[in-house]
Amino acid sequence: PAISAIAITPAPRSTPTIFLLGDSTDCEQSKEPFSSWGQMFPRWFKPEVVIANHAESGETYRDSIGRRRLDKILSVMKPGDWLLMQFGHNDQKQIAAKTGGPFTTYQAEIKKHIDAVRAHGGTPLILSPMERRGFDAAGKVISSLADYAEAARQSAQELKVAFIDLNAFSKLFYAALEARSPEFSRQAFAGQDNTH
């Protein structure tokens, strides 16, 4: 037995689409052992839903506007579609560069995304940035993205947008790995940078 052909047909235009927009923690990773939540996301949906992952490694909210990634999504978005957005890891670099921060530019850029999605009839959903895996001397998860997680939560509340606290969920996950055993926790991220 062998596969002799594969046919790929476009989904009907009416098929609901969930767009993903974010950084390396939700983009399609090209080589193992790197992985992201975004590339695992489609397995939770029936074939009647399209998952379109537009996340890109190294991206920020600002980049998704400047590099026209958001525009690309909006060009095909239809009423009833969703956009799930998760940034923060690379946005932190704007603090050192003195070009932004969580409660200033980050929140302003979130609002631009929300306004654009709503103008196209889509439904936005904000996710707080997943935490990096790191522990203090007492074995507690180090909170490296707390300001960005809080800024995302505040934005969702103020703009009346659905919100998933991925930061809190990922901290619980890392704590559970560490509780099983520090060695097990390290092996889960073997050869990794504690983010991917």
Region spans (language model):
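Alpha-helical cap/lid subdomain in secreted, periplasmic
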Residues: 11-12, 40, 68-196
